[in-house]
């Protein structure tokens, strides 16, 4: 699977360079998400621009990513193609995952999550 990660101070950006996220690549994608979380990445932003198709195992991998980062920070998808967004919406995953249009909005979502988590622990 083609997958690149750029690490920044408050988050990392993962780019999936794969047109199909299906049963052939989803186990590796799940593993990548879990490894990043175990390596101390608090929030992960995922660039989905190159992904044209996901099947149920691909959606499952995205859910694993969402779960892996929900405790420490946030999991954000951006640049989601129309077809993939339809599949995410049909499966109602758009109700549990943070999905935004671009990288700037994704970075803002990370900042907002940090502020909200900070308020929860300050009380």
Language-model features: where?
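Amphipathic alpha-helical interaction surfaces in cytosolic regulatory modules
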Residues: 21-97
């Amino acid at each position: 699977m083609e997958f690149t990660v750029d690490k920044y101070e408050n988050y990392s950006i993962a780019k999936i360079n794969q047109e199909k996220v299906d049963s052939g690549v989803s186990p590796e994608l799940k593993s990548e998400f879990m490894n990043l979380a175990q390596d101390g990445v608090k929030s992960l932003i995922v660039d989905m621009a190159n992904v044209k198709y996901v099947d149920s195992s691909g959606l499952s991998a995205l859910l694993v990513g969402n779960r892996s980062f929900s405790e420490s920070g946030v999991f954000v998808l951006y640049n989601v193609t129309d077809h993939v967004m339809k599949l995410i919406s049909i499966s109602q995953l758009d109700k549990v995952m943070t999905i935004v249009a671009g990288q700037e909005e994704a970075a803002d979502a990370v900042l907002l999550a940090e502020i909200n988590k900070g308020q929860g622990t300050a009380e």
